[in-house]
Regions:
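PLP-dependent amino-acid enzyme catalytic core
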Residues: 12-323
Length: 323
């Protein structure tokens, strides 16, 4: 994994020229084939129930190694096509890490400068990857989480609007549209009989975009959103919406059910998935899987699908203590 990111950095450093608007658009379009198209795997060892199947989408099998490649690509592409983002502007946003890595990977390939605001307690691995990709990092209070990072990004953008394109992933409709146009169709093509979709809430883009498209395909599909059980949790990237700033793209009407996941349960899944499913999961991926298992265990029949946003490579500090 580290080799992958260093390879991206080497590519980035070789881009020293400015492109015409048409060339820039062509280059961003050429990256489309590297985003999405991720495999669905059946979870068959740690969950077994007659009549019920559980599948998980391995989102690290794409550019930048996480589900956030989808939203980052959609946001950047639309901004370039609409003339809001050029090589003369700085791409700016708040992130807990993965969106930033996706932004920095794509921006680097397009020779677009990037500044990211993220909480100071983001994992060491994430910070090192972001810096290796050429991103300027502005660290914000760990106690304010991504809410504090958003506020800092907003202040920076307001201080010099002409210098920045503020992507604002928590407000940008291209976040959820990325999943509406890619994640959901991939699931439908692979598993047209899906009965339940389960996903955690962070920016909420994955749940909102995928959920909307699935409901259009089949209104009987049940959508289950997941949150941490408390504001003080260890699920990096997830939001406890009762105590955090609710993203503007969130649609509270979508979910048929809302479930909570304990951090400790996610850590248990990290261990069992590694031992029995040969899956090296991040805390948020394990939390999604924990929530999906919780749902699947209540069913007599059905096909349950969840998302594995990324693997454990960027969380060695945490995972080495768990395994």
């Amino acid at each position: 994994m580290w080799g992958f990111f260093h390879a991206e950095r080497s590519t980035m450093e070789s881009l020293t020229t400015y492109f015409s608007e048409n060339i820039l658009i062509q280059r961003i379009k050429s990256l489309e084939r590297k985003v999405g198209h991720t495999p669905l795997v059946r979870i068959s060892k740690i969950f077994q129930r007659k009549g019920v199947s559980l599948y998980a989408k391995k989102e690290w099998a794409q550019l930048s190694g996480s589900v956030k490649a989808r939203a980052a690509y959609q946001i950047i592409r639309r901004a370039i096509e609409e003339g809001e983002l050029t090589q003369q502007k700085i791409l700016l946003d708040a992130t807990s890490g993965n969106t930033g890595i996706a932004y920095a990977t794509i921006a680097g390939l397009l020779n677009i400068p990037i500044t990211l605001c993220l909480p100071e307690n983001a994992s060491k691995e994430r910070k090192e990857i972001l810096e290796s990709l050429g991103a300027k990092l502005i660290l914000t209070s760990r106690f304010e989480g991504t809410d504090g990072a958003q506020e800092r990004a907003r202040q920076i953008s307001n201080s010099d609007p002409s210098a920045y394109f503020y992507a604002d992933q928590y407000k940008n409709d291209n976040n959820w549209k990325a999943h509406y146009f890619s994640t959901a169709p991939e699931i439908i093509d692979a598993l047209p009989g899906i009965t339940h979709f389960v996903a955690g809430l962070g920016t909420t883009g994955t749940f909102v975009g995928t959920g909307r498209r699935l409901k259009e395909f089949n209104p009987d599909i049940k959508l289950i959103s997941l949150q941490p059980d408390t504001a003080l949790h260890g699920l990096e990237g997830w939001k406890h919406l009762e105590t955090a700033k609710v993203p503007q793209i969130f649609d509270s009407r979508l979910a048929d059910e809302n479930h909570e996941v304990k951090t400790e349960k996610a850590y248990e899944i990290i261990r069992s998935a590694w031992k029995h499913e040969d899956l090296y999961l991040s805390p948020s991926s394990a939390a999604n899987l924990a929530g999906a298992i919780q749902v699947a265990q209540t069913l007599k029949e059905g096909i349950v699908v969840t998302i594995l946003p990324d693997n454990g490579d960027k969380y060695a500090e945490i995972i080495n203590k768990i395994l």
